[in-house]
Swiss-Prot record:
PANTHER family: PHOSPHATIDYLCHOLINE:CERAMIDE CHOLINEPHOSPHOTRANSFERASE 2, SPHINGOMYELIN SYNTHETASE. It holds the Pfam family PAP2_C. Residues 279-335 are cytoplasmic. The active site is at H210, H253, D257. The lineage of its organism: Eukaryota, Metazoa, Ecdysozoa, Nematoda, Chromadorea. It is a multi-pass membrane protein. Signal peptide: none annotated. Pathway: Lipid metabolism; sphingolipid metabolism. Its EC number is 2.7.8.27. Belongs to the sphingomyelin synthase family. The keyword Transmembrane applies. This is Phosphatidylcholine:ceramide cholinephosphotransferase 2. The keyword Transcription does not apply.
Amino acid sequence: MTNSSEFTDVLQSRDPCVSNGIVINIDPIDPEPTPIRKEFTCEDTFHHEHHGNSEGFKTLTAFLCLMLSAFLNFFLLTVIHDVVPRQPLPDLTFMIIPQQRWAWSVGDVLSTVSSVVAFTIIFLHHQRWIVLRRTFLLGAIMYGLRAVILGVTFLPPSFHNRDEICQPQVNRTAMYGMEIATRFLTYVITLGLTSGQDKILCGDLMFSGHTVVLTIMYFVQLQYTPRGLVILRYIAAPITFLGIAALVVSGGHYTMDVLIAYWLTSHVFWSYHQIFEMRKDDRPQAPLSRLWWFWLCYWFESDVADGKLVNKWNWPLEGPQRMHTIMNRINYKLQ
């Protein structure tokens, strides 16, 4: 028990840290105050603030890695456009279904819809920084690998009417550097979305970047959606696969481009989650730790608790209070 003056001092204290680690628990049934061990100390508060800063820094670093990979893809496209041959390769899908250029816009729209849904889920997830960082990292890995493939093997455009769709190739003249810079800035501003352009750069085929985005966004929805929203997963599946099909039907990609992109992305995504949901002590000895990207990502996951993240939602902003109440009710119904 504690005396009255000590009890009053604790109640009036504004300091969130108690030096002796004791806080007073007031039981509504038993009016006698009972001292219990405080759940965190001054050191814990400092660690929590440091941990929050570290999480933000890691997320920013992951985003910069993604931007570096994406910009490298854009730059390579501006160069290889003038190198790739013009005669398209035979493709079974093109033999069965005539190419439909309107389908490319459908692929862009479905990619955007899937991304908006996935980032909304990330925004509402109570571990949003971890999920966002993982999404950035997975995108950086896939686009980094894609940059390597683009830089070593050049496939001809898959369009049958390539002269109407692809920009003309340019000889390396004195103005070639300015042409490359203009192309690069255009793709940076539009984030690679080309459905609104009359003519586009051609040659970035193996493997499909749109399919990478569609697949990662789809898997994010599968992995981080609360159990009560299982219907969302059934909506995400047709959006994803219709978007992938539209890319091929439009003639914008060979069938092998999207198949390889989906296969690689699925392996990287689920391998990443399998290994980083293990106990920290077991990760370096796991067979998947031999993957080339494991140690690149190890630092990003060093402060994440063992096991799978609990898929709960909360409102990330301080206000309005009504949104916090709504999120609590939604959480209760979705679990």
